[in-house]
Amino acid sequence: MIKNSLSKQENKILNYKLIRKYMSRFKSLGLYVSIVAAMLIWAFSFIWTKAALTSFRPMMLITCRLIIASVLLLLVSLLSGRFQKIQKKDLKWFLLLALFEPYLYYIGETFGLTMVSSTLASVIISTIPVFSPLLAFLILRERIGWFNVAGIILSLSGVFMVIFEPSGNFHVQPLGIVLLFFAVFSAVCYAVVLQKISIHYYTLNIILYQSLFGLMFFIPTTLLADYPYFSTLHFTLSSIEALLMLSIFASVIAYVLFARVVRRIGVARSNVFTNLIPVFTAIFSWLLLNEQLTILKWIGIATVVGGLFVS
């Protein structure tokens, strides 16, 4: 009897351990599904931006996107019970954060996308993690390793492969490339400022406040830049759909998914998945926008992704 009762108890413990093991595996699978979904959304955001720009002017598109996203983020923050008020000492950091991103970053990215392909834009933007250590070294005096240097060289080599044709011709507007690298610079500066406040606030609240403060910069700029064109704009259903997709999916859902994963597996492991964005964007652009991707361009994309892994 005693042996039987012990055997039953051991079986219960064994079953409990097996259940926990499988639950843990399902949770891990769920995390990876979440982060890949976030990367797919951000990859598609370049396609949506291209579609929205057929009707919207760049500044108006960004402002409308931020208004919708801010309302949704506020609702998510309140409903999840994670809403936090800003401490007075952090107000200047949030203003600086919003200046770099979304304000300067979106200006560079959106105007850049009016001049270059979605694929090239995603490849350049994907170099943000590569250049972050360089600025951290210059400003914060953080140590930069040889792997970081090698990653920068590889990534820039890959970008040049995507820009140039096999014949050596250059069919890209230089200003578009400059604007996209300006967006990269803004995002890297944003990451440096983010280190100052990230430990005190939930990620969701940081995204919410940077969107709200970003509107303080965007609304007057949009009125100055786009007001003369308000009466001449003609919106299509596809451009409005693209705006909603950018606002709901790219500015809210993808960030929430990414933040959830970062909390579980950390920033370093999460950022590895951003290497997928230019690959996904290239595939979407080829399938949906009929962008011509030569062998050299695919090699360039692979080189950029390799540089990201090395760094």
Residue map of PLM features:
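Membrane-interface helix-cap regions at the ends of transmembrane helices
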Residues: F44, W48-A51, S55, A69-Q87, ...
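Hydrophobic transmembrane alpha-helices of multi-pass small-molecule transport proteins
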Residues: L73, L95, L135, I144-E165, ...
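Glycine-/small-residue-enriched transmembrane alpha-helix faces in small-molecule transporters
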Residues: I2-M60, F170-K196, F217-F218
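Specific transmembrane alpha-helical segments of multi-pass solute transporters/efflux pumps
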Residues: I41, S45-F46, L74-I125, M161, ...
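Helix-helix packing/entry segments at the starts of transmembrane helices
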Residues: M39, I62-C64, Y106, L120-T127, ...
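Juxtamembrane helix-entry segments on the extracytoplasmic side of multipass membrane proteins
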Residues: K27-Y32, S55-M59, T63, I86-K92, ...
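Transmembrane alpha-helical segments that form core, pore/gating elements
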Residues: I47, L73, S132-L134, L138, ...
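Alpha-helical transmembrane segments of compact multi-pass small-molecule transporters, enriched
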Residues: S45, I68-L72, I124-L138, I153-L154, ...
